[in-house]
């Protein structure tokens, strides 16, 4: 397993906070030459530590005022059903996160919508994708913390 030094961690920490920095700006902030910074950043990308760089959009400015966490239970647990279900769910743009769970809930989805009527449209589409035993929706009342930054304390 590769190991990462202080400079690698600084690159990751800095890019998690602002991926729009040019290589020269990043190098200056962490105290490396531009060439060394570029090589290290490319190595982190090649190793898959940096998957991609994206723009984080404002949910509110996009008029997506409703966040819904949807718990799904199903009686189906075979591989072919899961593949069909997963492909159907992945095709719904309002589903922004999708997990297979342990415990009483088989799947958990995070859905963003304009309003309750818009969520109802998404819900109706969702239940048409596959035969589901139980669908439970919980509406977020307030976002207290939302971060895309991952902790770096576990990096070898």
Model-inferred region functions:
Residues 1-156:
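A compositional/biophysical signature of low hydrophobicity enriched in polar/charged and small residues
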């Amino acid at each position: 397993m590769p190991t990462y030094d202080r400079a690698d961690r600084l690159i990751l920490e800095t890019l998690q906070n602002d991926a729009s920095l040019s290589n020269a700006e990043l190098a200056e902030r962490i105290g490396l030459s531009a060439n060394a910074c570029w090589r290290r950043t490319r190595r982190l990308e090649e190793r898959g530590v940096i998957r991609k760089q994206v723009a984080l959009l404002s949910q509110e400015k996009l008029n997506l005022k409703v966040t819904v966490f949807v718990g799904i239970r199903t009686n189906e647990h075979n591989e072919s059903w899961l593949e069909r279900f997963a492909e159907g769910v992945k095709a719904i743009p309002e589903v922004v996160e999708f997990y297979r769970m342990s415990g009483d809930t088989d799947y958990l989805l995070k859905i963003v919508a304009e309003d309750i009527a818009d969520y109802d449209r998404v819900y109706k589409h969702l239940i048409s994708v596959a035969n589901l035993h139980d669908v439970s929706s919980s509406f977020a009342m307030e976002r207290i913390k939302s971060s895309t930054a991952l902790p770096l304390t576990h990096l070898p």
